[in-house]
Design a protein with these regions (language model features):
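N-terminal helix-turn-helix DNA-binding core of bacterial DNA-binding proteins
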Residues: 3, 7-40
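Beta-hairpin "wing" of winged helix-turn-helix
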Residues: 56-71
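Residue cluster at the C-terminal edge of the helix-turn-helix DNA-binding motif
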Residues: 54-57, 85
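C-terminal regulatory/oligomerization modules of transcriptional regulators
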Residues: 99-154
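Alpha-helical residues within the helix-turn-helix
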Residues: 36, 53-54
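Conserved segment of winged-helix/HTH DNA-binding domains
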Residues: 74-99, 110-119
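Basic amphipathic alpha-helical segments that dock to polyanions
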Residues: 45-53
Length: 154
């Protein structure tokens, strides 16, 4: 089993982190700067930022002083929102025993356990904010390393 983001989801998280580093509702960040800072493909970065804007997480401003910024403070943006903006709803859609849609949820021995695991993952993403990621990122940059379990308090 591989629980991983698609490339689009990965890029969306990195782009949101870049905007969050600027303090959220602060100054606008140029598309080019997001791409360079977060090692994103320059040709794909505008699409990723548009996904965040369409989800109401970021806003764009045209012009010399334009770019993108978060619409809310980083502490109010859950990682789950960013992931779902890029990936769609984080749900249990495939039967792990038979593949395809799950039609046996009321009689399946695995369904309850699998649903609980998915919900635990959703809860973790819901409780982790962009401010948490900025704090963890700063700790890593300062040589503190990656937290062993969870994120440090913001």
């Amino acid at each position: 089993m591989n629980l991983a983001l698609t490339r689009r989801g990965d890029y969306a998280v990195r782009a949101a982190l870049c905007l969050a580093r600027r303090g959220g509702e602060g100054g606008y960040v140029k598309i080019r700067e997001v791409a360079q800072t977060m090692a994103l493909p320059a040709s794909y970065t505008p699409q990723v930022l548009r996904l965040l804007a369409e989800a109401g997480l970021a806003e764009a401003r045209a012009g010399r002083d334009g770019g993108y910024r978060l619409t809310r403070p980083p502490g109010e943006v859950a990682l789950l929102e960013v992931v779902e903006a890029a990936e769609g709803p984080f749900t249990l859609e495939r039967c792990i025993l038979r593949g395809g849609p799950c039609h046996w949820e009321h009689v399946c021995a695995v369904h309850a356990a699998w649903s609980a695991a998915v919900e635990a993952c959703r809860d973790s993403l819901r409780q982790t904010t962009l401010a948490d990621l900025v704090a963890a990122d700063a700790r890593i940059e300062a040589g503190g390393g990656i937290p062993e379990r969870g994120l440090p308090p913001a």
